[in-house]
Amino acid sequence: MSVRTTAFKKASSSFHDFLVSILETSVTKRDARAYINKFAPLLERKRIGFKQQTSKSVAQKDGQDEPTESTPQQPLYHDSRVAKSLSALKTLGLISIVVVDCDGVDGSDSERRRVIDAQANRIAEAIDCFDEEGAVVLGTPLTIGDSVGKGTSPYVSEDLFVTDSSSLLQSLQDEKIPVIPSVGETEQSIAYKCVDANDAVLALTRQLSGLQFLGQPMEDKHIVQQLKATEVYRLIILDPVGGVPANNRATGRYMFLNLEQEYEEVTRSLTESTLNSDSKNPGTAQENQHHLRNSQMARKALSLLPSTSSAIITTPKDAANERPQEEADSGWPYVSTRRKLNPLIHNLLTDKPAQSSSLPSGRFTPVVSSNGAAQLGSSTTLAKRGMHVTILPDPRVSMWQPPRPGEPRLRLTDASVNLPRLVHLINDSFGRKLDVEHYLKRVEENLAGIIIAGEYEGGAILTWEKPWDADPAEDVDPSRLVPYLDKFAVLRKSQGAGGVADIVFNAMVRDCFPYGVCWRSRKDNPVNKWYHERSAGSHKIPDMNWAMFWTTPDLALDEQKFQDYKSVCRSVEPSWADKKHIVD
């Protein structure tokens, strides 16, 4: 868990230098502004958020509260390095709540209790070495209800709930990092039992989010007020298996996981992989179970939190971010690698994955993995509750193809499209008003489809365009029709955050036009850097203010297709109400 604290009031020249050095090297100007705007108000108020760490990982340090788990096998080296990362996060304004996992500890409840208490104290001592206020081990703020194990909803608090918030809130007020063993006290008898760390994290999340109910004991008014002033901001899951695997990604894992859209795909893939795993390879099935638990944990916790909250799933070693310098040589010929940014700090500053999920495979920067080998992209997954993606027509039913004469086709005036919201999205994103009548007429007969993210927070309109030398009155060879991205829009409030642009772009290149698409942009458009990173190539059209981009493989080797693409990007007529076509 993570809590934004009043660490800023302790700002000094050394802290200023520390912050500036990070902002200058790790994030964009927009990221820096967003971070400062979000955390500067913490001079006057505190907020709370969660982070969790699973098997073989320990508490994390950022200025927010994070629940984390650790096991007896957790190396002391990682305790120290992760503790240092948590302290750095706290310096940046985010305090952590650490949940210590007792999974993998054998023996009776009393024996397991002794072991987990020792783990909690070890973690707290590691934090004390790096943090002025240090850590505090809390006893048993959790109570086990009579119906333990029966609850199925993250909103239900009858299985495990928080009965003593005062010690937790006091430690946060004192800017100490709470370390909580995953132990609960039974409701009807004075007995202590180990509980599932995921359940402990959910119980704390419910309490700090104001969602603990169903007849649980009422806190006094002062504590209720304090709880209302908190905000669960981040969940961190540290697990040696790392981020969520993805067979259909060049990196082999999800860099960004849109839980609303991709959770079922994740569970289906991991379940199938487990069923197909060789009996001689039990490690694969075990790892898949870890990934499933991590994904489920992220989904349940984020369902309780604001849509701006997110979960980071990474390894303890990556969270510790300790790389021997000699590991920078990956052994990959002609490719240089770089040391990875600490995913906890990078995510706090940017709320983005270390590398964008919409980059083509050739653009992922090789990095040194946790085991010292080179890999594409990061081993960390950033998960958000995300948003549903609507694609019309649905490519799962039939791949997008140019419509044949007489076939029914999608139109923007269809009941399945909310045209007023679509127009508002375009107007807001471009800062210009669309000439709706002109635009509808232009795309009426050549609309390929549309992509809508969430409640029209982002979207794309794609068309089939005829090359310049085609007779407008005659049908064109379908093979020469150009797949064209006509409009790509994200609401201004969602630009640069939340992954909306990546979600829409991924849907376009993976589901709608996997074999390639082109688009154009003004040569002086600041978004062109983003386009360059995601395209297979670009070309500045002479005598015009347009630059052409495409994702089509080997386009430059096909002269006819290249000229067709170029002619479309030259000739598509803008449909803006201000008629300032000369600007384009």
Where are the predicted features?
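Active-site proximal loops enriched in glycine and acidic residues that flank catalytic Cys/His/Asp
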Residues: 239, 315, 460-464, 487-489, ...
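Nucleotide/pyrophosphate-binding catalytic subdomain
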Residues: 1-319, 412-416
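A conserved beta-strand-loop-helix scaffold within acyl/acetyltransferase catalytic domains
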Residues: 411-496
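Flexible, D/E/H-enriched segments
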Residues: 257-259, 267-386
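Short active-site-adjacent structural elements
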Residues: 188, 244-248, 320-324, 527-530, ...
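Conserved acetyl-CoA-binding loop-helix of GNAT-fold acetyltransferases
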Residues: 496-509
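Conserved beta-strand elements of beta-rich interaction domains across eukaryotes
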Residues: 185, 242-243, 467, 524, ...
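Terminal substrate-recognition subdomain of acyl/acetyltransferases
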Residues: 336-416, 420, 425-441, 491-492, ...
